[in-house]
């Protein structure tokens, strides 16, 4: 079968080694004669899977001991509600940074539970979209927490700064599309959450990292399935968890460790992004509308100078084994999502195709 590279923004490409191992183990996991999908989440066999996955995740991010790791349902949108329901306490407002589509979605959900103070961080630099530096974010005095999205998958915008607002500010962040792609100082955050379907594993699992002093503050109306304290007290098994997604994510964590960990992946991700942006920037045929300082290394949107060629580009790229390059309906054009599992060979195949397509159609 011809090589296919999947540039989907999520569910996204998984490492080939992980898929092959899962295939080998699918019907007879560890000699039990059953699939890991079939065994009880409370049995000792799956408990070992769960514990190893958490420890490997902790190792990869150097998560401090005073942080809890929760394996949850609900995706990022579930946490749009989970964050205010767990962290507001007796306060009625929180600071929300708006820098793109997903940040705005979090704000919309938060309005059901509080009166968010919106920090509009969107700016234009030399005609390109950018984000205000953190030093220009005007935080309010009475906010229960600060929320932002470090990587906007649709807009292709990244906020790479590490927050440093002092110990009194509880920083929360949606790391769904950038978790494990670069070193992360977990100690600068109160809550980090990430849907698994981009850089961790298959859809259906959500990871939450929460500082333990923030537990026990959930609103009385918070659904139990979103209550961090309930989930922590039940080892993320308050109800039946998405066991197969948990298992596969654990395999991805082991794969990441074998690649050299997050620091090694960060270098590879930089190389992939530089290769793709280099082709875009050295061409009048392709265009990216994000300022260099805020360009995402995970999601690279680009436009063709002649958008009547979009359909042809997508058809020919798909035939060449380069799948899921259509941009989000909000922005159009193309988008290449190049998460950890995308090898540099995949990006090279894309850039070679782009150069050839320009030669033939430019």
UniProtKB/Swiss-Prot annotation:
Binding, L-glutamate: 9, 42
Reaction catalysis annotation: O-phospho-L-serine + 2-oxoglutarate = 3-phosphooxypyruvate + L-glutamate; 4-(phosphooxy)-L-threonine + 2-oxoglutarate = (R)-3-hydroxy-2-oxo-4-phosphooxybutanoate + L-glutamate
InterPro entries, per the entry: Aminotrans_V_dom (IPR000192), Aminotrans_V_PyrdxlP_BS (IPR020578), Pser_aminoTfrase (IPR022278), PyrdxlP-dep_Trfase (IPR015424), PyrdxlP-dep_Trfase_major (IPR015421), PyrdxlP-dep_Trfase_small (IPR015422)
Cofactor comment: Binds 1 pyridoxal phosphate per subunit.
Keywords annotated in UniProt: Amino-acid biosynthesis, Aminotransferase, Cytoplasm, Pyridoxal phosphate, Pyridoxine biosynthesis, Serine biosynthesis, Transferase
GO process terms (BP): L-serine biosynthetic process; pyridoxine biosynthetic process
GO CC annotations on file: cytoplasm
Subcellular localization: Cytoplasm
Primary localisation category: cytoplasm
UniProt-listed Enzyme Commission number(s): 2.6.1.52
Positions with a binding annotation for pyridoxal 5'-phosphate: 76-77, 102, 153, 174, 197, 239-240
Entry cofactors: pyridoxal 5'-phosphate
GO MF term set: O-phospho-L-serine:2-oxoglutarate aminotransferase activity; pyridoxal phosphate binding
Function: Catalyzes the reversible conversion of 3-phosphohydroxypyruvate to phosphoserine and of 3-hydroxy-2-oxo-4-phosphonooxybutanoate to phosphohydroxythreonine.
Name of the molecule in the record: Phosphoserine aminotransferase
């Amino acid at each position: 079968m011809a090589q296919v590279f999947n540039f989907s923004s999520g569910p996204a490409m998984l490492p080939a080694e992980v898929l092959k191992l899962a295939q080998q183990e699918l019907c007879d996991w560890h000699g039990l004669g059953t699939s890991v999908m079939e065994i009880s989440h409370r049995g000792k066999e799956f408990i070992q899977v769960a514990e190893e996955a958490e420890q490997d995740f902790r190792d990869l991010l150097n998560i401090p001991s005073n942080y809890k790791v929760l394996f949850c349902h609900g995706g990022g949108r579930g946490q749009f509600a989970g964050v205010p329901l767990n962290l507001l306490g007796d306060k009625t407002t929180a600071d929300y940074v708006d820098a793109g589509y997903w940040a705005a979605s979090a704000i919309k959900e938060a309005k059901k539970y509080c009166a968010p103070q919106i920090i509009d961080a969107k700016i234009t630099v030399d005609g390109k979209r950018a984000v205000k530096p953190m030093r220009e974010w005007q935080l309010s005095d009475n906010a229960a927490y600060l929320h932002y999205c470090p990587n906007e998958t649709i807009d292709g915008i990244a906020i790479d700064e590490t927050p440093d607002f002092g110990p009194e500010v509880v920083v929360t962040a949606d790391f769904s599309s950038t978790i494990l792609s670069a070193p992360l100082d977990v100690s600068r955050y109160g809550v980090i959450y990430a849907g698994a379907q981009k850089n961790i594993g298959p859809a259906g699992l959500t990871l939450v990292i929460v500082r333990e002093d923030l537990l026990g503050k959930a609103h009385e109306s918070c659904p139990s399935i979103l209550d961090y304290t309930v989930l922590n007290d039940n080892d993320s098994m308050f109800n039946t968890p998405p066991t197969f997604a948990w298992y596969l994510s654990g395999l991805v964590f082991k794969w990441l460790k074998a690649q050299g960990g997050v620091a090694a992946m960060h270098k590879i991700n930089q190389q992939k992004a530089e290769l793709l942006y280099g082709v875009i920037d050295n061409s009048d045929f392709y265009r990216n509308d994000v300022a260099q300082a805020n360009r995402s290394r995970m999601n690279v949107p680009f436009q063709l100078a002649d958008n009547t060629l979009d359909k042809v580009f997508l058809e020919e790229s798909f035939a060449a084994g380069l799948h899921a390059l259509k941009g989000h309906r909000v922005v159009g054009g193309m988008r290449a999502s190049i998460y950890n599992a995308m090898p540099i060979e995949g990006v090279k195949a894309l850039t070679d195709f782009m150069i050839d397509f320009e030669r033939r159609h430019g």
